[in-house]
Amino acid sequence: MPKRIAVLGSTGSIGRQALDVVRSHPEKFKVVGLAAGRNWELLAEQAAEFAPGVVSVWSGDDAERVRVRLGGGVEVHAGEPGLSAVATWPAADILLVAVAGTTGLVPTVEAIQSGKDVALANKETLVVAGELVTELALGRGVQILPVDSEHSAVWQCTAYRRTEVTGVVLTASGGPFRRFSREELERVRPEDALRHPTWRMGPKITVDSATLMNKGLEVIEARWLFDVDYDRIEVVVHPESIIHGMARLRDGTVLACMSPTDMRLPIQYALSYPQRWETALPVLDFAALGELTFETPRRDLFSALDLAYQAGREGGTMPCVLNAANEVAVSAFLDGRLAFTDIPRVVAATMEQHESKRRPELGDILTADRWARETAAAAAERVS
């Protein structure tokens, strides 16, 4: 029987690659729900191809356009209620959450409450509400399956030996500016930051990779996925991006997961788990690779990584504030209103003004998110 999946963010980078995986295994999947943001035309094309029972797009006007284009036979929704409709669609066995930012939080919670497994490509959900979401999943008996390449790698290294793991290692490409001086970083333009050396991603996550904030967010995500303390989560720069994650075992052994830099691999494993299916992707040629190198992150120039560790250790609503302030700062940078080196300054200034609330409920998290966005916007105006 095919696995029935719903996809939030089907027109984005991860969503499109997930549908590529479905096309590679048409007998093993049935797409029952699709949700997109503003690209209603691509959503309509996807719906015509996969014939889901429900689709959603952000605006009501676009929803009407989709309705007219498809001509019936599918429920069409809009906005946040639309995301919820797709996330809780009764026919779905598993939900792939591939929307950006905190937009994915509420539908992820709703999917877990409805008893669905979640393939999570939206790291912000665990960053801002890791304690709440993991406790809820445990209580409902559902699985959170990591899609990020680094977390998928660690997951595969630790799957059957959790009690033997003493630490995890996340690798980072280092981004396009890992050898830049402070003066060169101050001159970075948005178009420079959007040229990632190894991965094909959306603009926000590409900038986060350049600042190392993406790796910082992944550290917080790893804390909740693998139940490890921050002192046991390491970050190492690995420019070749062949080793995606490692696990340290209690006898000193280190297990590493290596694969080509193609997101369809971790996407497929999350959707096929516990099975592992064949792919048509090229295998690693170690002789052609020649060497694998590792470096220590330059924390003096890329302070976002330490800000993430700080927020994670403080806990409560502080990781939510870190994430929201970063989203505001990155948006200002992409719009040309903020310098690249001011992104972590805006985040730090926002965190300094926040008094974290312990064990927050969903409402507390959403309130902290709104406060942080307003505070970060004001901070961005001051430093620009």
From Swiss-Prot:
Q: Which GO terms describe its biological process?
A: isopentenyl diphosphate biosynthetic process, methylerythritol 4-phosphate pathway involved in terpenoid biosynthetic process
Quick one: which residues bind 1-deoxy-D-xylulose 5-phosphate? 123, 149-150, 173, 196, 209, 214-215, 218
Residues binding Mn(2+) are: 148, 150, 218
Q: What is its EC number?
A: 1.1.1.267
**Reactions that this protein is recorded to catalyse:** 2-C-methyl-D-erythritol 4-phosphate + NADP(+) = 1-deoxy-D-xylulose 5-phosphate + NADPH + H(+)
Which InterPro entries does this chain map to?
Answer: DXP_reductoisomerase, DXP_reductoisomerase_C, DXP_reductoisomerase_N, DXPR_C, DXPR_C_sf, NAD(P)-bd_dom_sf
The answer on whether this UniProt entry bears the keyword Oxidoreductase reads yes
The protein's name: 1-deoxy-D-xylulose 5-phosphate reductoisomerase
At the highest ranks, the source species' classification is:
Bacteria, Bacillati, Bacillota, Clostridia, Thermoanaerobacterales
